[in-house]
Amino acid sequence: MVVIFHSFKNFKHGIFTLCLLINLIAWIGLFLFRIFSTFLLERAAVPLISFTNMTNIIIKHPFVATGLVIEFIVFLLLTFWLATIAIIGFKMLLTESFNWDTLFQKSLEVLGRYHLLGGIITGVYLLGFLPFLHFLFKTPWLSNLTLTSMVTEFVSRNPFSLVGGQLLYICLLYFLIRFYLVLPLMVLENSSIIAALKMSWQVTRTKSFWKKFWLALIKVFLIAWSGYLVILLLQVIADWILPAYNLLAINYALFSLWGIVSLGISITLAYTEVQITNPRGTFLLEFLLIAITFTLSFATGKVLFNQPINPVTIAHRGVNQKNGVPNTLESLKKTIKYHPDYIEMDVHMTKDNKFIVLHDNNLKKLAGIKAHPEDLTLAELKKLNVTANNHQTKLTDFDTYLKYANQHHQKLLIELKTTPNNATDFANIFAKRYCANIIENHHQLHTLDFQTLMILQNDIPKGNLNYLMPYNLTIPEENIHAYGMRYSTLSPDFVAINRQKHKLVYTWTPNSRLAINKALSLGVYGIVTDNVSQLHVAIKEAQHWSDAERLLQVLLYS
């Protein structure tokens, strides 16, 4: 604690102002990137960007693909420019030669000298250190960078990729630490990339460096989390003394501010022997930056926490805890007993324009044959034995599945699994055949295909239609009622913006307790999970969270 208070004593406004400015520029930049992505995709009638449609975008929409490449390059350049501002600004503060005009002039000169090379290097640094930055500094713009969660989810799909991913990440971290001086040498000394790599490797090879590194890391952790714990303590006191007042939004905003403050203090700790003075004219700027950051974070928190935790529960693919083969009648019969609000299931169109309940676009994994659902008739598909989760059964046609659900008053969340070859026919045939049934029994439809969704809106009310988004790269569409979002890409801002626009946000598929708690703390409308019984328990516990406990969940998982 002595170190922390000593740091406060020596910490001056200049670094805090600089960190605030960098954070605000990054935050605005991310928002502008979303607007640009939305503009590009809307003009080409492309609903979203994913690995599955990337080839289609490149071939059929080259201008959109070019625009997205340009956007990515601009993102790298912006990241490098902000890093340059930070490095030059801190150096100026240390030498008491700070000047805003000089800072921006020099940073632009460096940007012009290294341009894309500097952007790539900074991007690699950001990718490698992002998990630690997320954990230590709860700044608004970092909370919207969900790449860490996406990568973690991807490599966790099986033990081999998990172990391999962890080993690769450890190697990446080691080299990033060894080369941490590359950017400062390039920015401050105009070093070439080769010279900077050699110098950084030489400096970081000694035992004294690693000793200082671990000591600095411990200090940074203590500084950052001591502040967060103080804010949590204030919330605990507020829960006790002022239970009628909801101060969650205020403390959520304080988290954002403290994330920026602790970042500045952490940098200052490395130079405690130097008196850092406040550059002239920064008091008004600092006040404005604090006000803007606090207001934006407060607004997000206010929207997030203004409703109780009571999400719709949805059983993913009709199973609970692997109690059967997904998307089959046998599993439906078992899972209904757990009383989910909805059972999510998937539908493919067959060769004879009928519908089979099935998720995969290839039958190899479930049935052991190399065929697609649209290549076979419904009768042929129903003869297949499918195996999963140590269970074996037959595939179920959609009519039978739907009839059983209606008889037991079980609402369905139906995913329409279209392909590029059948999307239009699929939507028209499905809507004509099942529109009345879906409306009468309050079922919901969702799909990854935007054009399918637009066609369905001609026959089915928007309130029964949801749009699935694997990645959160655009701003909400006005004509979409609800979004299904991959839980690893959920961010507080995305949930808040949609709630402000009176749009619903579902999330899929959090299965661990930690992932479920993240979704609950952000106040999503519905949760799609493979473990609906665990979800019920988690919701009951979350409904008894104090405001401090909910704030802690947001702190840990956002």
Task: Name every feature range the model reports, one short phrase each.
Residues 359-463, 556-557:
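Metal-dependent phosphodiesterase/phospholipase catalytic core, i.e.
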Residues 324-334, 398, 426, 431, ...:
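Short, acidic/polar
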Residues 312-314, 342-344, 411-413, 442-444, ...:
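Structural preference for beta-strand elements that scaffold enzyme active sites
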Residues 301-375, 379-383, 400-404:
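Membrane-interface segments at or immediately adjacent to transmembrane helices
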Residues 317, 345-347, 414-418, 447-449, ...:
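A cross-domain feature marking catalytic cores of carbohydrate-active enzymes
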Residues 1-313:
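Hydrophobic alpha-helical membrane segments
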Residues 214, 467-558:
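C-terminal active-site rim and adjoining tail of enzyme catalytic domains
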Residues 316, 335, 346, 381, ...:
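Conserved, mostly hydrophobic/aromatic
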